[in-house]
């Protein structure tokens, strides 16, 4: 792990995320998507010697960066786990209902995209992997080698909102009959040929790579689980801040915040009064926050980012 990688990575909506967390100097915080530690270092800077920060990530490279930070700052600990396993991580530390803030910065990180060996980018030729943790589960190449045409099309439609999902799926099946699809450039070329030229407002492989990555890593399922578990782990008045990068993620976060802010209606025949049945609820704090033009100019990856923030109201 290059120690410069932590400082060179540009965290998105950094100032806005730190403000949103309203950090208590002696508080307990979780960075649920540690990455290369950009947000984590800013949180630590706002904490006193009594404050604590737990970083969570399943990427081995992120864990290595986290260990480097932990050696320099005893207030920080890193754990290799998925955000969907947050409940276990919190319970093991006795932090349940004590956490003052949780931050999720969703999606793939810049270092992951920039590393050809990770297989996330259609702009760099590398193994067709796409796993956040390359030691767990099947790679994109392994899945594409065995998936049926209908399944591939459905993944592209649901997770990539790709209108040409059937054409692309058919092209993938035809291509793999000739040669195994094991490289990112191979897949990108197959997808590009399946999409009409007049539809190429962005790179033709963008949606397909997003869809396959989300599917391979179970990203949306883990996000739904993580939101519920984060709410349960927060102390009253604790903050939940989520940075998303595409509509699928943001839709889930928006719906979760709205449902928890509204509360759930109890069945009329339940033998308890509604007022006596406390449920964990959220107060949505303002509208989504977008990057300012200056940040987008400095870091183009930030252009699609949005930050939603909510505060826990009751146990």
Swiss-Prot record:
Q: Please state the protein's primary subcellular location.
A: cytoplasm
Q: Where does S-adenosyl-L-methionine bind?
A: 37-39, 57, 105, 112
Q: Drop me one GO molecular function for this one.
A: rRNA (cytosine-N4-)-methyltransferase activity
Look up the record and give one Gene Ontology term from the biological process aspect: rRNA base methylation
**What Pfam families does its record include?**
Methyltransf_5
Give EC number(s), comma-separated: 2.1.1.199
Q: Which reaction does it catalyse?
A: cytidine(1402) in 16S rRNA + S-adenosyl-L-methionine = N(4)-methylcytidine(1402) in 16S rRNA + S-adenosyl-L-homocysteine + H(+)
Compartments (UniProt record): Cytoplasm
| Record's GO cellular component terms | cytoplasm
**Major enzyme class:** transferase
Claim: Heme is one of the keywords in the record = no
Q: Which UniProt keywords apply?
A: Cytoplasm, Methyltransferase, rRNA processing, S-adenosyl-L-methionine, Transferase
**Which HAMAP family does the entry mention?**
16SrRNA_methyltr_H (MF_01007)
Instruction: Name the protein family.
Output: Belongs to the methyltransferase superfamily. RsmH family.
Q: What does this protein do?
A: Specifically methylates the N4 position of cytidine in position 1402 (C1402) of 16S rRNA.
Name of the protein described by the UniProt record: Ribosomal RNA small subunit methyltransferase H
* Organism per entry: Nitrosococcus oceani (strain ATCC 19707 / BCRC 17464 / JCM 30415 / NCIMB 11848 / C-107)
Q: What is the primary gene name for this protein?
A: rsmH
